[in-house]
Design a protein with these regions (language model features):
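A polyanion-binding, active-site-adjacent surface
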Residues: 2-113, 117
Length: 119
């Protein structure tokens, strides 16, 4: 990751400008779903992930409350990511058919999944 991307990532993760969104993500991180009750939620803004020189940019609408807000990575740990990663793997764009948490070993070829501040 380049220094510019690292600076942008740090800026995004530390952002608290939209108080409504801060309250919402903090509430979700505190009032967990029963199935994730023993997991620690990320509860901060999430950043993009992937190859900064990618030819394919896949942009989602918003981080999932119990997916990205829980795992700390866009399109990770929820039902939409289960489907997405199977497709990416089948298309040879991902090295594995699933992504369950921020520090798993998933990587992309020619693909990045940004959040809107990157776009």
């Amino acid at each position: 990751m380049t220094n510019d991307f690292k600076k942008l990532e740090n800026s995004i993760v530390g952002c608290k400008k939209c108080t409504r969104l801060v309250r919402f993500r903090n509430k979700i991180a505190k009032d967990k779903r029963k199935q994730y009750i023993n997991q620690k939620y990320w509860g901060k803004p999430i950043t993009g992930f992937g190859d900064p020189k990618a030819r394919i940019l896949f942009v989602g609408l918003a981080p999932a409350a119990h997916g990205g807000n829980r795992t700390g990575r866009v399109f990770t740990g929820d039902r939409s990511s289960d489907f997405l990663y199977k497709c990416l793997y089948k298309a040879n764009l991902s090295n594995q058919p699933n992504s369950d948490h921020r520090n798993d070993a998933v990587s992309y070829t020619h693909l990045t999944l940004p959040t809107t501040p990157y776009v």
